Amino acid sequence: MNLTLQESFDHFLLHLQNTGDNTAETLAQHEQVFQWLSEYLIYYSDLFQAEGEETPSNLQVWEESLDNFIEQLIQGEYDSPPSLEGLPFDRIDGDYLRDFLAWHLLREPSVNSLMVQHATETLLSWLDHAKNQLWLDKDTLQHWQDVIQDTLPDAKRAAIAAHLLLYHIRLGGGVAPRLRGKRFETFKEGHARVAQVSESELWLTFDNAPKSMIGPVVLPKTILQHLRVGDVIDVELGKREGVWMIVDIGPVYPAVVYVPAEEMALPDKVM
């Protein structure tokens, strides 16, 4: 197959432009999804990994290395950034689409659950178009559709959890009046894995100390109902007077794209 991935994006967008009642705003939303997907595939997947490059074994170091690479790229320290122009369409598979929806997309600060839903619909429409153009066989289409549809509920749930946690922190994080203004005794930050969840509390672990649980962290039930054991939270925790609380929060990633560090065989990534 000589078709490139970029050509499949362009062909699909042109098809939408020439058919149906798609508005300029709708077309721009579809195009944005492909821009995000392109960023993930180029900078965060293993599709453009140079031979001989090694991947850090620690997941947090790995993500920090990726972010550093992006910063260097933005500053023009790389002469020839990779492109999807030469990437064959058949180089990707359902795993890339799953990791895009449940990891990379959730890193975007502006993304909410509705946008995750929209991105999913864009990908499914693109795959249907690819099948109609005979770029995909029936079995491959079905497998990719299953992967996307199985990923969607967890990706939306994680997006909701992240936004609720952010609002919770902005509103004071449920800190008791007697504790406000008092210094924290210690801090812990990084990618924390949800180890236990109850109706009012959760316990977290970090990959560098998987047997040491931190908690309980008291949270409203409306937040906890969107968290599952195995989810990973980019978080900063503070402890004062023996009470752990969330000080700062980043994305929440569903367990579907994270496994314990000791069980993970990290793919090579662009560094």
Task: Show the residue positions of the predicted features.
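Extreme N-terminal targeting and regulatory segments of eukaryotic proteins
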Residues: 1-5
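N-terminal core-binding DNA-recognition domain of tyrosine recombinases/integrases
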Residues: 7-155
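Surface-exposed beta-loop interaction hotspot
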Residues: 144-181
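Structural detector for short beta-strands of small beta-barrel domains
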Residues: 172-200
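Short nucleic-acid-contacting surface segments enriched for D/E, G, S/T with interspersed K/R
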Residues: 189, 219-236
